Amino acid sequence: MYSPPDSVVVDRIQRAFPSDELRERARATNLVERERKFDIVALFYTLSFGFAAGSDRSLQAFLERYVEMAECDELSYSSFHDWFEPGFVALLREILDDAIENLDTGRKDLNGRLERFRDVLIADATIVSLYQDAADVYAATGDNQSELKLHLTESLSTGLPTRFRTTDGKTHERSQLPTGEWVAGALILLDLGFYDFWLFDRIDKNDGWFVSRVKDDANFEIVEELRTWRGNSIPLEGESLQDVLDDLQRQEIDVQITLSFDRKRGSGASATRTFRLVGLLNEETGEYHLYLTNLGRD
């Protein structure tokens, strides 16, 4: 995949975040008046180009990069540490929010099989390791660690996020993807972090579409075959998925399955839905990649 030269990336970021605008925003805070060595431009670009992309993500490494970029003689660790207060965090959030709002979306119409959808939305999450002092706010799954989790839904037509949120590293992806009218007419692509039968049902009930990976141990009841095979193929109707999966050799599985889930969270009342299960054979491993969807064969 093509990657632009570093100089091109730097130029794009500098045009998106002009130095004069950064300084003007910083003057609205009390950091500039209180801290003589505070240089918002050097600090912002250090964060953009050096600290987050480097292998050493300690605050000390960040300080060293900042001193180099700001060309200041020296700066104590304690003074640098004190800059990271709620006011500075709010400033960074304001800069990011305005940048996203002012981006030229360059929306492209979906073509071919995708033109039937209002949009194709990809939901995912990623972990960012933080300085350990932040563990009280951004807890991690491991001990003595701090993690931030970014939850993002991206539009295929624009290449931009439609919604995003940050939480601590322990927060599960599924809890950060609401359902509602926003899914109507859109195809939602989901990874295993969003594997939830109740979620699939809500997307379908709100006139949306979904494609989700399936867990390895999923054992649905097959109620109908949507594609027939010639020869002595194994009949699947009425079988449980795990009972027949290892014996199949066909290139593709295309069946209707049933699944059960709680109709309302914690209510104990169950519901049963029928969805489509598609499997594609990986000839190198001999195993199937399985997907669950409410899309029809057309």
Task: Say what each PLM segment does.
Residues 70:
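Adenosine ribonucleotide-centric catalytic and binding domains
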Residues 1-59, 65, 73-74, 84-87, ...:
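Single, function-defining residue in the core of a domain
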